[in-house]
């Protein structure tokens, strides 16, 4: 099994944790990761864009002017797509952009993303992170203590106990390049809801340079993906 150091919020090493090779040390499958991210971004789309066609624009029931003897170009309706405020030709219509991926591929994509970051040395494990109240200054200190100040993007993924970690999430909102997400309940990691951007997901893992986990979350990930 692979090993990595466990740090506390002051940046001191307090032990080590073993990581399952089958989850954190596999050969990354870039094709499956692409498919997962493609699905995730597609599922974000509302698909509500809509433009009115000639038949849907209001007005235009009568001919604007006679066909002949005006010296003007002939036209039959103010709803003509060539007119300002007229209908739209081939405009967008409401559409379901959502995509699906089977559970096996979702698991492989998550394992691949985690393994990629671990092999790069960009996976940081802490014992726990908790704050009594939202405080950006304290969160900045934690980022600095963990040696992550120089990273362009840092992702904190915390356990699904939202009430316990809500202050940490709020404290990280105003720090540029820092994002804090509360992971889904482990049972939801590979179902449809795991593609939500506010849960453990491949897009955020790949989109951030450094990833910070708690020991509890590592164990739950191994339990579900193992």
Swiss-Prot record:
Keywords: Ribonucleoprotein, Ribosomal protein, RNA-binding, rRNA-binding. Pfam families: Ribosomal_L4. It comes from the Bacteria. The keyword RNA-binding applies. The keyword RNA-binding applies. Disulfide bonds: none annotated. InterPro entries: Ribosomal_uL4, Ribosomal_uL4-like, Ribosomal_uL4_dom_sf. One of its GO terms (biological process) is translation. GO terms for molecular function: rRNA binding; structural constituent of ribosome. One of its GO terms (cellular component) is ribosome. Residues 47-74 are annotated as: Disordered. NCBIfam families: rplD_bact. PANTHER family: 50S RIBOSOMAL PROTEIN L4, LARGE RIBOSOMAL SUBUNIT PROTEIN UL4M. Part of the 50S ribosomal subunit. Belongs to the universal ribosomal protein uL4 family. One of the primary rRNA binding proteins, this protein initially binds near the 5'-end of the 23S rRNA. It is important during the early stages of 50S assembly. It makes multiple contacts with different domains of the 23S rRNA in the assembled 50S subunit and ribosome. Forms part of the polypeptide exit tunnel. This is Large ribosomal subunit protein uL4. The lineage of its organism: Bacteria, Thermotogati, Thermotogota, Thermotogae, Kosmotogales.
């Amino acid at each position: 099994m692979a090993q990595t150091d466990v740090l506390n919020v002051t940046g001191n090493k307090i032990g080590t944790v073993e990581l399952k090779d089958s989850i954190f040390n596999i050969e990354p499958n870039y094709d499956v990761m692409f498919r997962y991210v493609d699905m995730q971004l597609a599922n974000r789309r509302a698909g509500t864009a809509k433009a009115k066609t000639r038949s849907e624009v209001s007005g235009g029931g009568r001919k604007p002017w006679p066909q002949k003897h005006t010296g003007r170009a002939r036209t039959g309706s103010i709803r003509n797509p060539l007119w300002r405020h007229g209908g739209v030709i081939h405009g967008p219509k409401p559409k379901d952009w959502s995509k699906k991926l089977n559970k096996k591929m979702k698991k492989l994509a998550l394992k691949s993303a985690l393994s990629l970051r671990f092999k790069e040395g960009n996976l940081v494990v802490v014992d726990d992170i908790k704050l009594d109240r939202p405080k950006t200054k304290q969160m900045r200190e934690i980022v600095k203590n963990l040696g992550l100040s120089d990273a362009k993007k840092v992702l904190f993924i915390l356990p699904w106990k939202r009430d316990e970690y809500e202050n940490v999430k709020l404290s990280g909102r105003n720090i540029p390049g820092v994002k804090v997400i509360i992971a889904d309940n482990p049972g939801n990691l590979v179902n449809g809801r795991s593609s939500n951007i506010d849960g453990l997901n491949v897009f955020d893992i790949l989109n951030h340079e450094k990833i910070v986990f708690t020991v509890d979350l590592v164990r739950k990930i191994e339990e579900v993906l193992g």
